[in-house]
Amino acid sequence: MNGAMSGRLFTTAHRRIGVLYLYLSLAAVVVGTLLSLLMRIHRVWPDAPLPFYGLMKPEDYLALVTMHGTLMIFFVLTVAPQSGFANLVLPAQIGARQMAFPRLNAAAFWLAFIAFLILIGVFFVPQGAPISGWTNYPPLSAVAAAGPGQGAGMDVWLASIAVFCLSS
């Protein structure tokens, strides 16, 4: 990687970190919107097979709802205003030249990015994504027999949320 690219990615400047947060939020918007489109396609044509997938089962629809809600709430509505715009605007508003702990600020971004990758990795778990909704309320989250994805998929989902909480 050349120096200019690594300087932008591994920076401690608050403005660049704010832009990285906004890019992460934009990526979450794109993935969440694609999941929303898949849900809407299924609602319009419930018996039509999806390309590259086949017929969508009710558990798959619940998994899409779970992942769409998680992405939009945690990685869009939390990351963009609180981390992205706060890093861009807040230091300039208070007259600071830089953040008090710039390396900690950069580490928080990379933890959020890792949490995003872990969350996307839920789709590649053999049992599938969890079907408990973005709130993760019982009974769907507490009963392993509620459906596929409630085993390893739920564990990976919880690991993603735990890493995301560490980043904030």
Give residue spans per PLM region.
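...captures the hydrophobic TM-helix bundle architecture rather than a specific catalytic motif
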Residues: M1-S168
